[in-house]
């Protein structure tokens, strides 16, 4: 494929303060598609299509592969147009849309707006470098599957997740485009906020974004408020250039936030030497094949990460978050639907890990989340009063005290959930032949 659009992307990004290492180039990998690698020959600094005189060298440890200024990021924050370093560079959305839609949905519509703005968009070179709405084969996620493709995921968690995502995204799109079509001053856009464009924008965010918590307070340069929305909400953010490396859980990289020097930016640094000619990967954390296929459009053969999902009610989610902060020091699971990983071999055991061996097969936070979901009234009141009493960290909490019945229930639910998933996979496989 032609890499000209990536040459334009790099030129535009560098003009606005972005950086790409001189030993790094963009190339078209036959297996992975557009990727980054350490220069394999005397070719262009940034594109595997020209020639120059730079020697072949490995990429040393701690080297910065790429960096992107926060001012070049694209998200809901730009649509707000409230922060000097996060401007919209576009017509501001109607106040009603900004008030009633969730941050991630507004971000999706903002990307659609940039696509419709075409050459006049501030992010035009970036948008043109992305897989385009008509390039369904490059997008590759289950929402672009044919009927023949869907037959292969029938009966699996992926089929359920695909159907739920399509339903949710369509609902979000309908709410948003109705507001835009009915808003004064937006008449020329009527009919252009199509489902295909919204699905494309949401897919771009699901497959290439970083989380909003990576943007530090120093970037805002003013008190942080969203009106009726909370900054505790986590939403996706696109960072041009940073989304070029492909994902690998084996990649040893660091995401470095710079707020001391201008431009304030986010960088990807490698932790070990990468020989010339080798692809440079990013690491978005361990993910199951269900998550990878749903969000990115690929899976990893032999991946030991499986996932189980639960959809807690709002009250339950608040209790789960409170307990995870007290027990684990962080939130675990998705913001609306708790998704946790399960492995056939135990996770690495920290020195202070006193969990049952069976509990070490599931990701931190899973057992405690299930404990909340399966608790009776007495047990839930106890959890609220004692958020730091974590059954995942104490054998005493499992077999003694007020939560012993609850933990036995958790083990039963985990077992049933995994057996159900295994049965569905075997059954579907038999029908496929």
Model-inferred region functions:
Residues 2-42, 49-70, 77-81, 125-433:
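Long, positively charged leader/targeting segments at protein N-termini
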Residues 74-128:
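Eukaryotic helix-linker segments that join adjacent hydrophobic helices
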């Amino acid at each position: 494929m032609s890499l000209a659009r990536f040459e334009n992307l790099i030129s535009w990004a560098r003009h606005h303060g972005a950086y790409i290492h001189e030993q790094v180039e963009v190339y078209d990998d036959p297996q992975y598609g557009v990727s980054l690698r350490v220069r394999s020959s005397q070719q262009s600094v940034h594109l595997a299509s020209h020639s120059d005189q730079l020697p072949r060298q490995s990429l040393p440890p701690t080297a910065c592969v790429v960096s992107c200024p926060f001012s070049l990021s694209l998200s809901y924050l730009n649509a707000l147009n409230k922060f000097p370093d996060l401007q919209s560079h576009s017509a501001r959305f109607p106040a009603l849309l900004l008030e009633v839609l969730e941050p991630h949905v507004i971000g999706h519509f903002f990307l659609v707006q940039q696509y419709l703005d075409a050459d006049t968009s501030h992010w035009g070179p970036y948008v043109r470098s992305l897989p385009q709405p008509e390039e369904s084969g490059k997008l590759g996620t289950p929402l672009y599957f044919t009927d023949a493709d869907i037959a292969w995921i029938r009966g699996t968690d992926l089929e359920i997740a695909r159907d739920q995502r399509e339903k949710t995204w369509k609902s979000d799109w309908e709410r948003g485009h109705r507001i835009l079509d009915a808003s004064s001053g937006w008449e020329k856009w009527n009919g252009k906020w199509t489902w295909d464009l919204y699905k494309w924008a949401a897919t771009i965010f699901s497959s290439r974004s970083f989380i909003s918590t990576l943007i530090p307070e120093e970037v805002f340069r003013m008190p942080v408020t969203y009106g009726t929305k909370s900054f505790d909400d986590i939403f996706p953010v696109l960072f041009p250039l940073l989304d070029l490396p492909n994902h690998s859980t084996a990649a040893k990289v660091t995401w470095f936030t710079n707020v001391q020097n201008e431009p304030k930016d986010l960088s990807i640094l490698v932790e070990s030497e990468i020989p010339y000619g080798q692809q440079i990967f990013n690491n978005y954390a361990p993910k199951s094949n269900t998550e990878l296929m749903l969000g990115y459009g690929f899976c990893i053969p032999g991946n030991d990460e499986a996932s189980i999902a639960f959809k807690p009610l709002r009250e339950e989610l608040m209790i789960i978050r409170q307990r995870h902060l007290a027990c684990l020091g962080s939130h675990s699971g998705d913001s609306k639907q708790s998704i946790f990983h399960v492995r056939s071999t135990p996770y690495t055991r920290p020195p202070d890990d006193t969990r049952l061996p069976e509990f070490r097969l599931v990701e931190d936070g899973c057992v405690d989340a299930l404990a909340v979901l399966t608790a009776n009234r007495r047990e839930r009141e106890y959890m609220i009063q004692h958020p730091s009493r974590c059954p995942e960290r104490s054998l005493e909490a499992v077999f003694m005290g007020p939560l012993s019945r609850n933990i036995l229930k958790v083990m039963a639910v985990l077992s049933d959930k995994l057996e159900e998933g295994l049965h569905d996979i075997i059954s579907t496989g038999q029908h496929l032949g």
